[in-house]
Every structure is written in C-alpha cells, then in structure tokens.
C-alpha cells in the first residue's frame, strides 16, 4: 500500500478520516489502572492515551510501561470481624471498620469499640 514501507503521517490521518476513523490524544493523564478478575491490576504511570472513534465506537489506546500489582489482602478474616462484633457488642460493619483502622489488631479494635 505504501511503497518502501514509509507512511506520511498527514496522508495516514486523511486516509483514516476518509474511513470514518478519528483519533485524539488525551493530555494530562497521570495513571491508568486495569483491574483484573484475580484482584490484581495493571498500572500505567504517566501513559500516553489516545481516544479513537471508529464507526460510532470509542477505543482507548494506552501506551507505556505496565506494572502488575498484586491484590491487597486484608490483615483479618470474616471470623475476626464476627469475633470483634460479638465481643464489642457492635455490628459487623463497625467491627470491620475498627479492624481496618487498627491494621487487623483484634484486641485494639475491641478496646476502641468498647471505649466509644
């Protein structure tokens, strides 16, 4: 299609418009995260992002170095939440919040809840 394999960017843009394709760079993007089913995520810091519109559908192209982040595990279990809720006489929601604030320390969470 293009002799010598070289593509003139202006010709390419014109050809894309003729085919009903639009593209627009998105500036100011600091971070892009793609959340995966297993709880991990792909994180792109300061990527180049381009929005493309082809036949009334939008596509986003993300370019940059991806870093895979593993899911954060809670430092406590559902059993811990139930125990704290029971011991402190509060709801499981309040117990979970207290455990999050104390980094999973059961005794500290119970004492905080009883002190309120």
From Swiss-Prot:
One GO biological process term is: protein transport
Question: Which SMART domains would you find in this protein's record?
Answer: NAC
| Pfam name, any one | NAC
Q: Does the keyword Membrane apply?
A: no
Which InterPro entries does the record cross-reference, listed alphabetically?
Answer: NAC-like_UBA, NAC_A/B_dom_sf, NAC_arc, Nas_poly-pep-assoc_cplx_dom, UBA-like_sf
In the UniProt record, the gene name given for this protein reads nac
Identify this protein by name: Nascent polypeptide-associated complex protein
Functional description taken from the UniProt entry: Contacts the emerging nascent chain on the ribosome.
Complex formation? Homodimer. Interacts with the ribosome. Binds ribosomal RNA.
Look up and give the organism this protein is from.
Answer: Methanopyrus kandleri (strain AV19 / DSM 6324 / JCM 9639 / NBRC 100938)
**PROSITE patterns recorded for this chain?**
NAC_AB
Provide the GO MF annotations for this entry. RNA binding
Recorded superkingdom = Archaea
Give the family, as the similarity comment puts it: Belongs to the NAC-alpha family.
Q: Where is the NAC-A/B domain?
A: 6-75
Q: Which UniProt keywords apply?
A: Protein transport, RNA-binding, Transport
